[in-house]
Amino acid sequence: IRDSIHLAEILKSLNGKKYIFTNANFEHVEKVLEKLHMTNIFDGCFDISESDYMPKPHKEVYDSFQNKFNLDNSSTAMFEDLHINLREPHKMGWQTVWVTNNLEYNLNKDVNQQEDIQKIIDEKGYISHVTDDLENFLKNVI
């Protein structure tokens, strides 16, 4: 995990509430947030125990998350590193952002993978945005 003071500052400057929605447990989340210098940025956390250990991408988990934090579908965005976890949020009307490790590498690795990624992005229709640089993506949002 790469810490980023810049990303922490950008997240702090974003309007609206920010929540963590994870298949990990809360203890892991706390350790990661501490390492990233982001302990006081988020308004809440929904970890795997909150869903009785049912992970994303099950629809019921997103419904529970939405209900816990009383989210308005029209003003909710989901940032996720696994694109499959964006399908249900998209159906719910959320903006979806697929955060990849290295988009250029993923798109150019080989023909089959490039076609698969393009199919996911273009044909599946559940990804609103794709980025491999979260800091710059968020800078352009604010």
Question: What does each model-identified segment do?
Answer:
Residues 1-20, 26-30, 59:
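Short, acidic loop-to-helix structural element flanking the phosphoryl-transfer center
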